[in-house]
Amino acid sequence: GNTEKQLAMLLDMQATVLIGTASYGLLLAEEAKKRGIADQLKLRKAIFGSERWGEKMRTRMEQILGLESYDIYGLTEIYGPGIGIDCDLHCGIHYFPEYIYCEIIDPQTGEILPPGELGELVITTLTKEGMPLLRYRTRDLTYLDPEPCKCGLPYPLMGRILGRSDDTVKIKGVNVYPGQVEDVIRMTPGLSSEYQMIIDREDGKDSVLIRVEEDPERHNPRAAWEFKHNIKAIINIIADVEVTPYQTLPRSEKKSKRVYDRRNLD
């Protein structure tokens, strides 16, 4: 926290590596640009974890701060600071099979899924003492990549975390993960990384409003229409869409809240 102090320390200490949440990294980047000090920072690398973050957020932070960012994955219950991280190709998370055994299951049935299929990550620790974990359900949604990474590292790959099974919202019978919305944002020109999804229910009918910020570097007058069309085609829900000016949605020094489910489901 304390953005003013963090920016001062980055300048005074000429730090070359930044570690934190991606939400806070974006906040620091935007504040540095706003104050005209982004080009004075010496950052070269960043490691972000503790939350799901997408490619548009990665691109935005890297453009402003002139660094390369890495996605680290970990759980308090297993090891610290992380149990996997992406490589220079940024095509997934390399994990360490000598320490953990990973499986993917159907979060509803518990059935083990084959490599490449999306499901809930289950981890068994192989060397942990004191509190070993057997088939621990992480609630994190990903898949195991059956192919070796082209970077040449011997460590297997899992996909970047799409979301959590307990963050899933059901809208008109369709399970929706926040990561799916971020993927649609990524493929829609003219949109930035920040969004909110607001779900209401009136007279027994669900409604969805998605607010997403415009990309300050790329104007697309059809962005709202294209995003709405892509949401319907890919996620199979109908949503109202508002494209808001850049930096109008709230920023966070911790984890950003994306989904607001205001339905009374009792």
Where are the regions that the model predicts?
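Active-site glycine/GP-rich loop and adjacent strand/helix microenvironment
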Residues: 1-266
